[in-house]
Amino acid sequence: MEKTVIYLLEDGYVDFVVEKIRTKMEKLLEEKDKIFVVLAGGRTPLPVYEKLAEQKFPWNRIHFFLSDERYVPLDSDQSNFRNINEVLFSRAKIPSGNVHYVDTSLPIEKACEKYEREIRSATDQFDLAILGMGPDGHVASIFDLETGNKDNLVTFTDPSGDPKVPRVTLTFRALNTSLYVLFLIRGKEKINRLTEILKDTPLPAYFVRGKEKTVWFVGK
């Protein structure tokens, strides 16, 4: 049964979040041969990923997927893949076959199709989704409900957000296969959006929930 937990953190945000993620991943790995984890882009989770890279996980048993990607070259400093790779994938020496990302060298429709095929061939659900939320309440690159409600697992957007570029994103349908959803948010604007979500305001992040549990890690 889905439930929601909120942690309000004054200090030690990164260490607290990493410990919670480590504990959850270790428990999942005790129960399953392989686990499937969604990672958000953006700035907030990067220090968390950097600390996760120091953990002694059996990385060959963990498959990672990006929640969304900016439609820019993979070596661009705006690329979610590049930024996560620098702090996690390369540091932890995660096998390349366990890292699933959007091939932005393809036309955007083809990139979506390829990423969706890759997801479907790997799993029918995610075990853990580590997500963020924008100050406007967007999640992944779902800035409006029409995008989130697409029937596919993967879709694309017109130029949106900051930087204002086209994006590829998992949809609500994909994200809501996750057993556990962890939202990492910091700052007053995002806290205000969470307050609205708790009052059932239909912002995009409102519609993403873990099948077992949804956890919000809220920092200053």
Swiss-Prot record:
Q: Which domain of life is it from?
A: Bacteria
Pfam families recorded for this chain? Glucosamine_iso
Keyword Hydrolase carried by entry: yes
**UniProt keyword Ribosomal protein, yes or no:** no
Please provide the record's keywords in A-Z order. Answer: Hydrolase
Q: In which pathway does it act?
A: Carbohydrate degradation; pentose phosphate pathway; D-ribulose 5-phosphate from D-glucose 6-phosphate (oxidative stage): step 2/3
Instruction: Provide the E.C. number(s) assigned to this enzyme.
Output: 3.1.1.31
Q: Name one GO molecular function term.
A: 6-phosphogluconolactonase activity
- A single BP term in Gene Ontology: pentose-phosphate shunt
Q: Which InterPro entries match?
A: 6-phosphogluconolactonase_DevB, Glc/Gal-6P_isomerase, NagB/RpiA_transferase-like, PGLS
What chemistry does it catalyse, as a reaction equation? Answer: 6-phospho-D-glucono-1,5-lactone + H2O = 6-phospho-D-gluconate + H(+)
The cross-references to PANTHER family, in alphabetical order and at most eight, read: 6-PHOSPHOGLUCONOLACTONASE (PTHR11054:SF0)
| Family statement drawn from the similarity comment of this UniProt entry | Belongs to the glucosamine/galactosamine-6-phosphate isomerase family. 6-phosphogluconolactonase subfamily.
NCBIfam families tied to this protein: pgl (TIGR01198)
Function, as annotated, reads: Hydrolysis of 6-phosphogluconolactone to 6-phosphogluconate.
Protein's name according to its UniProt entry: 6-phosphogluconolactonase
Species name for this entry?
Thermotoga maritima (strain ATCC 43589 / DSM 3109 / JCM 10099 / NBRC 100826 / MSB8)
